[in-house]
């Protein structure tokens, strides 16, 4: 009923309906065609479906016009992920699911929004064509089977030639939000004489991550 509009609605409502439908369609591949071996890799279902829904909507907008859905994603979904990642209950995207109670708690902003955000970074890191080629080979190799994180990483490495071990450890297996701050000196004339970008990590998760500034 929520998505059967009976009157004029906002563009945000249309976007929400679109990405919900695209998310569920994505599960035909991420979840149905290939299913994770255990709930540790729940993100292989949900993060991918989340990313795929916004990626597909962005392609539609490029072809037919409309607002970039990644703007809405950054304002709403990514903010949800940031918020949950600063709570005591945060966990890695690729989490250690010790039992089914842990699984139920991890259908959250980390698994959906932060996972999709990190996948967007991964696409930029390996290149979109390489990423899609690697995912295609992942489906071909494991169709109607069960997988884990290493299976996907192998295909992405084969397609891109990029070493993904550091990316995996710092972004997928380490929780928490790092902070980037400007540190600078200004002379008497108001000119910047030094400008550095300093990264800090939460005390609970003291891991610095590679960033590209642009």
Protein language model regions, located:
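Hydrophobic alpha-helical and helix-loop surface patches within well-folded domains
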Residues: 1-204
């Amino acid at each position: 009923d929520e998505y059967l509009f009976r009157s004029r609605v906002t563009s945000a409502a249309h976007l929400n309906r679109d990405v919900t439908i695209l998310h569920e369609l994505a599960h035909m591949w991420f979840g149905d065609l290939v299913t994770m071996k255990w709930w540790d890799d729940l993100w292989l279902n949900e993060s991918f479906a989340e990313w795929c829904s916004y990626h597909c909507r962005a392609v539609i907008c490029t072809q037919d016009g409309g607002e970039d859905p990644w703007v809405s994603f950054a304002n709403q979904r990514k903010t949800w992920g940031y918020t949950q990642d600063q709570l005591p209950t945060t966990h890695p995207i690729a989490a250690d699911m010790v039992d089914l109670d842990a699984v139920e708690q991890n259908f959250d902003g980390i698994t959906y929004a932060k996972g999709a955000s990190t996948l967007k970074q991964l696409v930029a890191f390996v290149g979109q064509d390489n990423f899609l080629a690697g995912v295609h080979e992942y489906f071909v190799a494991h169709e109607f089977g069960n997988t884990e994180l290493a299976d996907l990483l192998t295909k992405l490495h084969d397609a891109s030639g990029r070493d993904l071990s550091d990316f995996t450890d710092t972004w997928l297996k380490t929780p928490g939000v790092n902070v980037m701050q400007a540190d600078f000196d200004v002379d008497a004339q108001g000119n910047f004489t030094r400008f550095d970008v300093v990264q800090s990590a939460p005390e609970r998760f003291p891991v610095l991550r590679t960033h590209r500034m642009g």
